[in-house]
């Protein structure tokens, strides 16, 4: 992949936050394509001389599916009007009740896509593509029930690695982050607990459930992971974004984890929508010094936030609950 310029906007004058929102948010509105009721919780990666993405688009019947999109600058997007049509050796794998919350990463020679796949309940679907035109679906990673499958962008000790959040069949009122390994992207094992919810009130914004967000990327300190945390309030679930640093060689070991959230729902498009009070990270573009994070806002639109990687690392270490 070619190294390209990530989307970027400097910190506003007077802003002291570690991360800040794009001034023109939302980047993608709910009616970006004719059929959509909402577009959110979507994945973006560098591709050729621009960017490609896999987008969660719920239609006006609120059927959940994933669509491809392309952009020159990571801000202005051309999203397909039709969902991805997968190819698979086992045709049963193509049938699903829903597909949502995709993540995408490049590993070695192809792009890998994961998503929440409705196969007798929520599990993690896996597919690969070389060109974002043809997609080849593999076996589901796990039995139901599981969500938030996030692959590491390189093998660890010769094996693929994936974060996930085992759950139940409903709108999960619990959940911790686990890691699993695979020699071939088909058979998964060596399951280890990575992060658990925090006890109330030590870090209450993440005391109900947590889940991996964007694909982690390697820094001098270890793997930097953005994740979501949830608290149950009188007004329902509230989703915010935090960060953690995982050991480079043994990512089941958490070195640092934020006590305070990086971004919580505060802007109107995060507070109001189909599911109010949600900031849900799904993708991060970085150039070694800076990062642009794409997140779902109120389960309705896509927002973007920026930050300097070293400042985020410093914040993660300074506020760590570990």
Curated annotation (Swiss-Prot):
It is an enzyme of class 2 (transferase). The keyword Lipoprotein does not apply. The keyword Transport does not apply. Its EC number is 2.4.1.320. It catalyses: 4-O-beta-D-mannopyranosyl-N-acetyl-D-glucosamine + phosphate = alpha-D-mannose 1-phosphate + N-acetyl-D-glucosamine. InterPro entries: Glyco_hydro_beta-prop_sf, Mannoside_phosphorylase. Optimum pH is 5.5. It comes from the Bacteria. Gene3D superfamilies: Glycosyl hydrolase domain, family 43. GO terms for molecular function: glycosyltransferase activity. Keywords: Carbohydrate metabolism, Glycosyltransferase, Transferase. Involved in the N-glycan catabolism by catalyzing the reversible phosphorolysis of beta-1,4-D-mannosyl-N-acetyl-D-glucosamine (ManGlcNAc) in a sequential mechanism to yield N-acetyl-D-glucosamine (GlcNAc) and alpha-D-mannose 1-phosphate. It can also use beta-1,4-D-mannosyl-N-acetyl-D-glucosamine-N,N-diacetylchitobiose (ManGlcNAc2) and N,N-diacetylchitobiose (GlcNAc2) as substrates. Belongs to the glycosyl hydrolase 130 family. Homotetramer. This is 1,4-beta-mannosyl-N-acetylglucosamine phosphorylase. It comes from Bacteroides thetaiotaomicron (strain ATCC 29148 / DSM 2079 / JCM 5827 / CCUG 10774 / NCTC 10582 / VPI-5482 / E50).
């Amino acid at each position: 992949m070619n190294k390209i310029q990530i989307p970027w906007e400097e910190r506003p004058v007077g802003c002291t936050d570690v991360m800040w929102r794009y001034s023109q948010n939302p980047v993608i509105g709910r009616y970006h394509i004719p059929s959509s009721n909402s577009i959110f919780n979507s994945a973006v990666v560098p591709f050729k001389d621009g960017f490609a993405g896999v987008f969660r688009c719920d239609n006006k019947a609120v059927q959940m599916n994933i669509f491809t999109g392309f952009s020159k600058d990571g801000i202005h997007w051309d999203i397909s009007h039709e969902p991805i049509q997968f190819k698979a050796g086992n045709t049963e794998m193509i049938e699903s009740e829903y597909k949502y919350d995709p993540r995408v990463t490049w590993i070695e020679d192809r792009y890998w896509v994961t998503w929440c796949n409705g196969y007798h309940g929520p599990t993690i679907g896996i597919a690969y593509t070389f060109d974002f035109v043809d997609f080849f679906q593999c076996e589901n990673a796990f039995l139901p029930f599981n969500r938030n499958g996030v692959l590491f962008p390189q093998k660890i000790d010769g094996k693929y690695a994936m974060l996930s959040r085992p759950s139940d069949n409903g709108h999960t009122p619990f959940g911790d982050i686990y890691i699993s390994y695979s020699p071939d992207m088909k058979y998964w094992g060596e399951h280890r607990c990575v992060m658990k919810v925090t006890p109330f009130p030590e870090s209450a914004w993440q005391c109900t459930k947590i889940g991996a967000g964007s694909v982690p990327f390697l820094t001098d300190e270890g793997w930097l992971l953005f994740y979501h945390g949830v608290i149950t309030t009188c007004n329902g679930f509230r989703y915010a974004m935090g960060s953690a640093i995982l050991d480079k060689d043994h990512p089941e070991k958490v070195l640092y984890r934020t006590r305070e959230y990086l971004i919580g729902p505060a802007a109107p498009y995060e507070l109001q929508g189909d599911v109010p009070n949600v900031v849900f990270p799904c993708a991060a573009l970085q150039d070694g010094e800076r990062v642009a994070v794409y997140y779902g806002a109120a389960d309705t639109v896509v927002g973007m936030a920026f930050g300097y990687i070293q400042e985020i690392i410093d914040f993660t270490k300074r506020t760590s609950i570990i």
